[in-house]
Regions:
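Extracellular adhesion/carbohydrate-binding repeat motifs centered on closely spaced tryptophans
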Residues: 1-461
């Protein structure tokens, strides 16, 4: 006759109900203890008192099993059970997974972390690891089947397995995780880093990696780097130390972290330009596909030419420069009249304005404001020194380092000296050719030849 959960009662040896519990008797009428007995398709465990064990974790040798409220051993099943080792870093309850033979998964004898593929109720297969006691591991996990806890767990952890009710190994995916880092002095750091876990579940460390078309840099502890990072331009014997001029890479904001390629605007890091960093002033940069930024050169981008200093900051405004084959050898921003180069100086003048886009090198005629005064400039439109201010007589004007030479306002006519000769120009700076007895505001008469050179000057015609 059957009783309880699939238990068949026999008159002699076998299962017997004693009025309060099930026991299993041998032929000598001795109740068995600390062993498994089967009834039908289920296994049951008899404890040290000979009674059937119910709703309890059973430790049998080196293995763990669980019997339900009917005493039957469970199989292919998750169970959340009280944790005998609960504490500050341990939960009050832990998860076990009992295989088809009822035995709980646990760490292998080698102690090395081993993941088991388990089909969830949803039909999705995930990978889980367990410690030597059969507890499902979660959070940061090392390679010795142990959880890593504490403020710097992110440094020592190799795998990440979700929270205490998840446990699934993160693989081929990003996770933004809590990470206390006393060494990060960035004011925008919010005690979290992004990490990427390979398909084997291990976090990427100390490497550059392209993921979904974006390039990332990972620190030695696996954190995705962001903002300014100095990266050597080569490895091994060919390695060149990272410096502001050769290896500044920018890896975006903390919520993006990928390598900035093309245009981006940001505050330079202290290793790039300390003054700009302290001033919290943003500049445009142009990121290169393999890291670093364009530095110390003219570069044509989408049909427009721009200038970049030795730290990669886009130039904007009027500059005197020494340039060779588009490489900027020296530069100084001109912010007032006293900084303008003289006729015999070796520097040439360039202007990076606001149209058609900010920072575009100007060519041809344009107006430049300096010290509150507007001047006309003309910059070369072609040649190896395209963009440099023209010198000498050009288009009926006299230019010095690109600046049109003009006379005092209201004078009508005036004299400009160039290469030892005197030329007559009008109020707008245009050379006056073949003029006879034209009079300026001071009642002085002038006559000029076909080149505009003065042939007569006096109070009379």
């Amino acid at each position: 006759m059957a009783f309880g959960f699939g238990i068949t009662s026999y008159a002699a040896a076998g299962w017997q109900w004693d009025g309060s519990d099930w026991r299993y008797f041998q032929r000598d009428n001795e109740a068995v203890t600390n062993t498994w007995k089967k009834s039908g398709s289920h296994w049951f465990y008899l404890g040290s008192d000979g009674c059937m064990v119910r709703s309890r974790l059973v430790e049998d040798g080196d293995d763990y099993y669980y019997v339900n409220s009917s005493g039957a051993r469970v199989a292919n099943e998750w169970r959340k059970l009280p944790n005998s080792e609960s504490g500050s870093d341990e939960p009050d309850e832990v998860w076990y997974y009992f295989q088809s033979n009822g035995r709980a998964y646990k760490a292998p004898d080698s102690g090395r972390t081993s993941f088991k593929s388990i089909v969830k109720a949803s039909g999705e297969t995930k990978k889980y690891a367990f410690d030597s006691n059969g507890h499902m591991l979660f959070g940061w996990v090392n390679e010795e089947s142990e959880r890593v806890t504490g403020d710097e767990a992110w440094k020592e952890g190799v795998y990440y397995c979700g929270d205490e009710d998840d446990g699934a190994m993160v693989q081929g995916a990003w996770r933004q995780l809590e990470a206390m880092d006393s060494g990060n002095e960035d004011s925008s750091f919010n005690d979290e880093y992004w990490f990427y876990f390979n398909t084997n579940g291990k976090k990427i460390t100390g490497a550059k990696k392209t993921i979904n078309g974006h390039k990332y840099l990972f620190g030695e502890d696996g954190e995705a780097k962001y903002k300014w990072q100095s990266v050597p331009v080569a490895t091994g014997s060919a390695a060149v130390p990272a410096t502001p001029s050769n290896a500044n890479s920018y890896y975006k904001r903390p919520d993006q972290c990928w390598l900035a390629v093309g245009w981006f605007k940001t505050v330079p890091g202290p290793e790039v330009d300390m003054q700009a960093y302290e001033d919290d002033e943003e500049y445009w940069f142009y990121g290169l596909p393999n890291g670093g930024v364009v530095t110390s050169q003219f570069k044509t981008i989408n049909g427009h030419t721009y200038g970049f200093n030795e730290n990669g900051m886009m130039l904007h405004g009027l500059y005197k420069m020494k340039v060779e084959n588009k490489k900027i050898l020296s530069y100084e921003k001109i912010e007032n009249e006293s900084q303008l180069p003289q006729a015999g100086d070796s520097e040439k003048v360039y202007y990076f304005g606001d149209t058609p886009k900010e920072g575009v090198m100007k060519t041809g005629r344009c107006s430049v404001d300096l010290d509150g005064e507007r001047s006309t400039y003309y910059f070369k439109t072609s040649g190896t020194d395209r963009g440099a201010g023209v010198e000498g007589i050009y288009d009926d004007g006299i230019y010095e380092k690109g600046r049109l030479q003009t006379i005092e306002y209201g004078m009508r006519y005036g004299v400009i000296k160039y290469q030892g000769k005197e030329y007559l120009v009008n109020q707008s700076g245009k050379i006056q050719k073949n003029k006879k007895n034209v009079k300026d505001a001071d009642e002085v008469y002038y006559s000029t030849d076909k080149d505009g050179i003065i042939t007569h000057r006096g109070n009379k015609e």
